Amino acid sequence: MISFSLINFSNNLSWDKVTNLIFKLQKRLFKVSYVYDRKKLYVLQKIIVQLNYSRLLAIKLVNHSVFNENLPGVDGYVSLNFYESFELNEFLKYNWNNWIFQNLKKVSLFDNDGKIIVKKVPVISDRVWCYLVKFAIEPVHEALFHPFNLGYRSQYFIYEIQELILLNLSKFSFGSKKRVLKLDLSQNFCINNYSFLMEKLIAPRCIKLGIFKLLEKGFVLEFSNNCIFNKVDFSSLLLNIFLNGIEKLHNCIRYGYFLLFFLNPIDNEKELLSKIYLFLSKLDLKFNISEIELSSIINGFDFLGWHFKFSYKSYNNLCIFPSFDNYNKFLTRIKVIINNSNYGSIIKASKIYPIVKDWKEYHKYSDLFDLNYSLCFIKKRAFKIFKSESKQDFYSSKSLLLKCFSVFNIFNKDLKNLYNKFFKPLNFRHLVFLFNRGGEGFKYFYFCIHCGVILL
């Protein structure tokens, strides 16, 4: 009887129905939390955590999540089979409100810049509990977060940051008269006191105790691409809850650790900095003056690998270029591959193509037609290396060069189209919110938080 029930359970389970059911509950929780009804809010959070569907979906997401490296925890498990996941489901059913975490395993990884960083990897069962809690916490704080907090939301593209900067610095908003104050909170960012985070966190007491136990075990709150919680995004969610409220000090955009304040000619930057220091002192965080950068739009400024500069020739009086550091890192990555004698020309071309494609896709709204970003010198060097190989001649090396660098037809879209597309929704980021469950097979739902009308 037990084996028959298990086989029937595995065959009849539809993950589309599971995601639809959890999505409906999260949408209801979002509306209740926006009105800030505490009683219904806690009841809906407990219903989401106690659902069998949410537990099974959390186990499935942990088992099938693709990381850069399969990093096991202290127990040594990378994934669970069907019987182990079924036992974990039954264990979560009775112990989710009194969860005991195991020790975290220290693992050294390479960062995007080539630096060695130390990460603390939890066990699979602890990751499942974090997924389960995230289902109940994320819609609540999504309704209360500032609309210009773009640090962790997976449904927002990174190009929306360009749209917001264009909105604040275009000629229609007198952007040439404004200044920009850029802050970087990533240096020396260490949280010593978690009591302020527990006060901001909106969840039942049992979930708060579980998160506090996880933080006491040594779980680090950070925005990192190489973190084991890259898909879960639980660390960045808690850190966004911790830093929530800094966007209300002034008109700004926050993406992770980076803040960009837009200052009018009347605004005083010293008063703004005093407000920021006061806010960070309440959070028990240290902040250095070297991490502050004040610049005008005419001189230009760098933000997230882009360089924004005022220009009368462009449509919006604002030009976007790749930043100097971003361009140099891109060139060094290509030069390392070209100058490596262990690879042949065909392997070099296959390794160069995705790097060039990703870089041009990231800067598809930037002005790459300038001579500085035409890549003519690196193309000449690559052609010389390809031609020096005995197996290649002039025509074959020319075809390899075209395969590597000829991806500009797909990208380099007009910045005017981006700006016109930005003004289509009249109630941008105020009444209509976007929920995306991820994946190409799902639809994008826009719905009003007051009347509940769904816009497809």
UniProtKB/Swiss-Prot annotation:
One of its GO terms (cellular component) is plastid. The keyword Plastid applies. It holds the Pfam family RVT_N. GO terms for biological process: mRNA processing. The keyword Plastid applies. Could be required for group III intron excision. To group II intron maturases. This is Maturase-like protein 1. It comes from Euglena longa (Euglenophycean alga). The lineage of its organism: Eukaryota, Discoba, Euglenozoa, Euglenida, Spirocuta. The gene is mat1.
